[in-house]
Amino acid sequence: MKDLDEILYDALRADESLMEAVGGRIVSTCFEVGPDGQDNTPLPCIIVTDDGWQNQPASKDDDWETDEDRVTASIEVDADSPKEVKRIVRMCRRVVSAYIAQMMDNDEEIPELDSLQSSQLAWDWMKPCYWQTLTYNCTTNITDDHEQD
């Protein structure tokens, strides 16, 4: 089974209209660009990040660790204008939703998506650019096969 950040990255890179909208600049902190290189990515761009996981028992009476992890990955959209950020964010949401539906139709194993959150639109004076982040959360079972290729 693919990790959440890989699913998001693959979904975004598979869509030709989104790739065209950002000039092919869809990168991942896990595969291509480190956090220090994010400031040097030309605009507009999309940066996919693996934001880690959390394992928490349902109650204090449970074991200290359960088989389920809550995994988080994000899509950061950077652009020159707020309007462009919003347009690309909407495209990202549509693309990811369609990609996951297609994976389910093909009976591919995917993590159980729990929620989607969005940050507020913000200004980064150091880059400089406007940006917004979509954060996807899912539940995975640590007993499932998560080996990397």
Protein language model regions, located:
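Small/polar-rich, solvent-exposed N-terminal microdomains that initiate assembly or binding
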Residues: 1-62, 147-149
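Short, charged, surface-exposed interaction patches
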Residues: 39-67, 111-130
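Residue-level signal for secondary-structure boundary sites
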Residues: 56, 83-85, 142-146
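Oligomerization/assembly interface segments of phage tail-like spikes and tubes
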Residues: 66-83, 129-141
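Extracellular/virion structural assembly segments
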Residues: 78-98
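Acidic-leaning, charged glycine-interspersed low-complexity segments
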Residues: 94-149
